[in-house]
Amino acid sequence: WAPAIREAGGVPEMYKTGHSLVKARMRELDSPLGGEMSGHIFFKERWYGFDDGTYAGCRLLEIVSREQDPSAVLNALPTSFSTPELNVACAEGEPHALTAQLQALAPEVFDASAQSSTIDGLRVDWADGFGLIRASNTTPVLVLRFEGHTQAALHRIEAQMLALLERVKPGAQVGSAAH
């Protein structure tokens, strides 16, 4: 999404997961819009600081209805392929230690085409997608998300990130999040 935000004149920023953290960061930056992959969407205008799925849907409809061809606007948005939120159960306190190990290993594992960020766990960005492994803020699990511009990119990124995870937690059982 970052390239699409830049093309529209915005300034994207990656930040820590958690609705209260995102809202606070939006206030610091005076950001008009913020969101998380979990679906929390925050609008500064007319509804500052609250996230509500119905409201976000209505605002999207309001915004695209201003256009001559709303379908063209929606069809122009970037498409991608992603996993649902995945979890790896851990012992109490283990997720943060594992995350630190992943962050330390990343520079020796990934080549120069991969950009690593340690703002919230380990996120590795490639030109065609990203992988994220972070400690949950609420439960003793690692949270994993993978996204690619194509199915092939998604599978490659997921395989590379899971291979890295295997180095710090051999035999890790990856399962769907229980939401």
What feature does the model see in each segment?
Residues 1-145, 150-179:
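Phosphate-binding and adjacent anionic-ligand microenvironments
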